[in-house]
Amino acid sequence: MPAESTSPAELRAGGCQTRPVQPRRLLLIRHARAAGGPVDLERPLTEQGMRQAAAIGPWLEETGLVPDRVLVSPARRAVQTWEQASAALSSGVQPISEARIHDNTVDALLAAIREAREDVVTLAVVGHNPSVGELAGVLDDGRGDPVARRKVEAGFPAGGVAVFDLAVPLTAVGPGAATLSDFRVPGD
């Protein structure tokens, strides 16, 4: 008979002790409030947007959701959002500029996410609507937090962060493959 401290996963592995698997997470972050402008890629954050973005970092730190990999749209407002958010983080994770995020399609976002390295535990994607909101809607398997789900369905506001727990590797992320565990707009 296995010891009481043997986990179900260890039992399935024939009683062999294994390292606990750290749950993978995906953070979808919509850039904070931005100013208008004639050149989309150059639109900056407003003062309110700067405050919104600055509130994201402390929230990520306090909730233990600091990503170990960040993909950011090359648009100025997305880059500024991550710069402001990351200023409060204890880790020095450097963002990776990902042009496909600015394509603003669910397929482009999924393609970028699926290329994450195998060792990534928490991946953050800083992008734009409508693709961020649409992806949040299709990823959810319906078993997550109902309050968070209602917030996502009501619209994905500027500065919003959707937190998904993944039961699959990032390479297999797709519709219905994640559980929405939280949705916040830090600073609001």
What are these regions (language model features)?
Residues 120-142:
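A glycine-rich beta-strand to alpha-helix segment
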